């Protein structure tokens, strides 16, 4: 197992909680029989200490120690702000 911290990029889909956001991570998976690439989405709860992000922002997150029952990721930076 590597000691490198996992980082991912995703889109903020909810920012209604205090110091927390929900980020959707999209990935493509090849169908085992037909070979077609299918889009799969994973929603992660992320700790946002300063409430920096809004809905629609592209953010970079990294894995950390468990902060609560569902939060074990933290916000690194906002890559791109959403166009309102």
Curated annotation (Swiss-Prot):
One Pfam family here: Ribosomal_S17
Keywords: Ribonucleoprotein, Ribosomal protein, RNA-binding, rRNA-binding
GO molecular function: rRNA binding; structural constituent of ribosome
GO-annotated biological processes: translation
InterPro entries hit by this protein: NA-bd_OB-fold, Ribosomal_uS17, Ribosomal_uS17_bact/chlr, Ribosomal_uS17_CS
Domain of life, source organism: Bacteria
Family: Belongs to the universal ribosomal protein uS17 family.
Listed name of the protein: Small ribosomal subunit protein uS17
Annotated organism of origin: Sodalis glossinidius (strain morsitans)
């Amino acid at each position: 197992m590597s000691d490198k911290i996992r980082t991912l990029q995703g889109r903020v889909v909810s920012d209604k909680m205090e110091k927390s956001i929900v980020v959707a991570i999209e990935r493509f998976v090849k169908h085992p029989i037909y070979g077609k690439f299918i889009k799969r989405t994973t929603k992660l709860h992320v700790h946002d200490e300063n409430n920096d992000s809004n809905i629609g922002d592209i953010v970079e997150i990294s894995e950390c120690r468990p902060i609560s029952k569902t939060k074990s990721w933290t916000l690194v930076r906002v890559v791109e702000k959403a166009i309102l």
